[in-house]
């Protein structure tokens, strides 16, 4: 298992500095991670830092971390991020709309980002710690219907992160052709392997180096 290629090497805290983004990108190049995941303000800089290796992508976040923006705002964010060099976007669904069973809005919200991305890879963040199993399943179904490429557990900014049980449910719901990303609380090799064994095809973590070197991080993301 080439574990590094599963990892989105992540730095999303508000206080993340330019020096920390520089280090993040250098580490991603060294370890050959799938991507760096950064806030939109750092996309252009990260793209410049990673231009020597087409295999290490720039991932950013949309409607993050609450998912409470309108579809139109999320679409604008998506276009702006791609113009700045983003290769992948991780959007947060409208969590309240899902809880209200306003499935038309949930789907329209996802589809707005998918259409704005125009072929750029889209991952849909559910914030599974806030959802029932039925809501997770419904979010996965709506993500597939709206044309998303991936479903993702968590922002890393709420009360819980990825669980093996949720990853398994998401994989069972979306089938074999959609990616599943585990994020939030994956801190070591054993945790990452458990997620992959349950069906994850990507791991979002700030602990990427610890994961691939057999160490452990205390980071929540």
From Swiss-Prot:
Protein name as it appears in the record: Deoxyribose-phosphate aldolase
Domain of life: Bacteria
GO cellular component annotations of the record: cytoplasm
InterPro entries, A to Z: Aldolase_TIM, DeoC, DeoC/FbaB/LacD_aldolase, DeoC_typeI
Enzyme class at the top of the EC tree: lyase
One Gene Ontology biological process: 2-deoxyribose 1-phosphate catabolic process
Molecular function terms, GO-annotated: deoxyribose-phosphate aldolase activity
Residues in coiled coil: none
Organism encoding this protein: Exiguobacterium sp. (strain ATCC BAA-1283 / AT1b)
Stated family: Belongs to the DeoC/FbaB aldolase family. DeoC type 1 subfamily.
The protein's annotated pathway: Carbohydrate degradation; 2-deoxy-D-ribose 1-phosphate degradation; D-glyceraldehyde 3-phosphate and acetaldehyde from 2-deoxy-alpha-D-ribose 1-phosphate: step 2/2
Primary location recorded for the protein, binned into one broad class: cytoplasm
Record-annotated active site: 90, 152, 181
Chain's gene name: deoC
Localisation: Cytoplasm
Purpose of the protein: Catalyzes a reversible aldol reaction between acetaldehyde and D-glyceraldehyde 3-phosphate to generate 2-deoxy-D-ribose 5-phosphate.
The entry's keywords: Cytoplasm, Lyase, Schiff base
Phylogenetic classification of the source organism: Bacteria, Bacillati, Bacillota, Bacilli, Bacillales
The keyword Lipid metabolism appears for this protein: no
């Amino acid at each position: 298992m080439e574990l590094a290629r599963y990892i989105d090497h992540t730095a999303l805290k508000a206080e993340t500095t330019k020096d920390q983004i520089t280090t993040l990108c250098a580490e991603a190049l060294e370890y050959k991670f799938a991507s760096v995941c950064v806030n939109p303000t750092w996309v252009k800089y990260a793209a410049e830092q990673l231009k020597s290796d087409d295999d290490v992508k720039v991932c950013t976040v949309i409607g993050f971390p609450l998912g409470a923006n309108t579809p139109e705002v999320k679409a604008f964010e998506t276009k702006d991020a791609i113009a700045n060099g983003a290769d992948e976007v991780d959007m947060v669904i409208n969590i309240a709309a899902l809880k209200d069973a306003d499935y038309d809005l949930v789907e329209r919200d996802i589809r707005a980002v998918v259409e704005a991305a125009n072929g750029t890879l889209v991952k849909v963040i559910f914030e599974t710690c806030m959802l029932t199993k039925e809501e997770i399943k419904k979010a996965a179904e709506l993500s597939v219907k709206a044309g998303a490429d991936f479903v993702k557990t968590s922002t890393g900014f709420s009360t819980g992160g990825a669980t093996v049980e949720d990853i398994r449910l998401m994989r069972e719901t979306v089938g074999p052709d959609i990616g599943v990303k585990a994020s939030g609380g994956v801190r070591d090799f054993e945790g990452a392997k458990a997620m992959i064994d349950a069906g994850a095809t990507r791991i979002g973590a700030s602990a990427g180096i610890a994961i691939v070197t057999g160490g452990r991080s205390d980071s929540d993301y």
